């Protein structure tokens, strides 16, 4: 079957032209049948044309988008009829309905006392239906803990999502008996932060958790082993950007600190030492070398390590980097 072709200059042809073409394809297999040029789709006009010779390959194309039009992001959000995407950060993945606590009707008017009592009963039953068994209640409590701790650290949603998936796996493989919900939730967040290269030290995690450092460490090792989590050893350099930001130091300090850590790693002095202590000492040394004064106490507070650790690592890092001594 042949289709009549029309070009922008009004000429006609009778060569065979495929009636259906990919709207966004620009490779050779879906090029212009006349000159093999790239095809361009005008969604407003419903036309697919050749960008080289102007051949109209397809006319009156079907618009697969919504039937409504929006001219800005706000209008698009208001007219969209789909809900939020599913998320592992909620125990029901965000698929259930939640009744708000505003006690107002659709027009913004305050509900009467009788209506408020009715809504309170509905909320109570709604919450019961959302968590139908002990497993869902367990998951709801744990994900709430993960959200609370991640918010305290300012961790991105990607880390929270990963931590939620790790906890779901631990729950699914029955790793919780004999361990607290808070302990497993904290270890899941600790592992997720390390996997995303935004690590937090055990001391930092323990400062916002409801369990102590020892339990977090034990639970983390158990969960990582049972779930075969791929968690690489923490790179001290991954702490440097956060420390520099908290201390309001420049990018020069951050770059110098990374160079010092790289030299220390090449010299083999980082093995068996705390990554947090190495990062703190490198930031302190880099600040002094770039004439941006910062005290050991300030670095100690931000990194949550002792000043003694900073002093010890400081001299080792300078020696490894071949830097001249700077009075601490």
Swiss-Prot record:
UniProt keyword DNA-binding present: no
GO MF annotation terms: DNA-binding transcription factor activity; TBP-class protein binding; zinc ion binding
General function of this protein: Stabilizes TBP binding to an archaeal box-A promoter. Also responsible for recruiting RNA polymerase II to the pre-initiation complex (DNA-TBP-TFIIB).
Domain of life: Archaea
Name of the protein in its database record: Transcription initiation factor IIB 4
UniProt repeat feature Sequence, residue ranges: 144-227, 238-319
UniProt cross-references to InterPro entries, sorted A to Z: Cyclin-like_dom, Cyclin-like_sf, TFIIB, TFIIB_arc, TFIIB_CS, TFIIB_cyclin, Znf_TFIIB
Record's GO cellular component terms: transcription preinitiation complex
Keyword Metal-binding: yes
Gene of this entry: tfbD
Region named Disordered: 1-47
């Amino acid at each position: 079957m042949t289709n009549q072709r029309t070009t922008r200059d009004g000429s006609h042809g009778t060569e065979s032209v495929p009636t259906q073409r990919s709207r966004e394809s620009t490779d050779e297999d879906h090029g212009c049948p006349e000159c093999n040029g790239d095809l361009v789709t005008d969604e407003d006009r419903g036309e697919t044309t050749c960008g080289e010779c102007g051949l109209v390959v397809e006319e009156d194309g079907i618009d697969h988008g919504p039937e409504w039009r929006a001219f800005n992001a706000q209008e698009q959000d208001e007219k969209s009829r789909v809900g939020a995407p599913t998320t592992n950060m909620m125990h029901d993945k965000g698929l259930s309905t939640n009744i708000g606590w505003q006690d107002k009707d659709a027009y913004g008017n305050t509900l009467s006392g009788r209506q408020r009592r009715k809504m309170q009963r509905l909320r109570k039953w709604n919450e019961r239906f959302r968590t139908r068994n002990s497993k869902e209640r367990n998951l709801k409590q744990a994900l709430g803990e993960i959200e609370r701790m991640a918010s305290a650290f300012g961790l991105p949603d990607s880390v929270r999502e990963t931590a939620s998936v790790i906890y779901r796996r631990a729950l699914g493989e029955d790793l919780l008996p004999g361990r607290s919900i808070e302990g497993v939730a904290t270890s899941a967040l600790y592992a997720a932060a390390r996997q995303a290269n935004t690590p937090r030290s055990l001391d930092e995690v323990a400062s916002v958790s409801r369990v102590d450092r020892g339990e977090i460490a034990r639970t983390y090792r158990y969960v990582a082993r049972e779930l075969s989590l791929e968690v690489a050893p923490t790179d001290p350099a991954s702490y440097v950007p956060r420390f520099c930001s908290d201390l309001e130091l420049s990018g020069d300090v951050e770059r110098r600190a990374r160079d010092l850590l790289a030299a220390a790693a090449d010299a083999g002095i980082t093995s068996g030492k705390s990554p947090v202590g190495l990062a703190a000492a490198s930031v302190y040394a880099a600040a002094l070398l770039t004439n941006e004064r910062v005290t050991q106490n300030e670095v100690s507070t931000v990194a949550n390590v002792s000043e003694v650790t900073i002093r010890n690592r400081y001299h080792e890092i300078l020696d490894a980097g071949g830097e001249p001594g700077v009075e601490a």
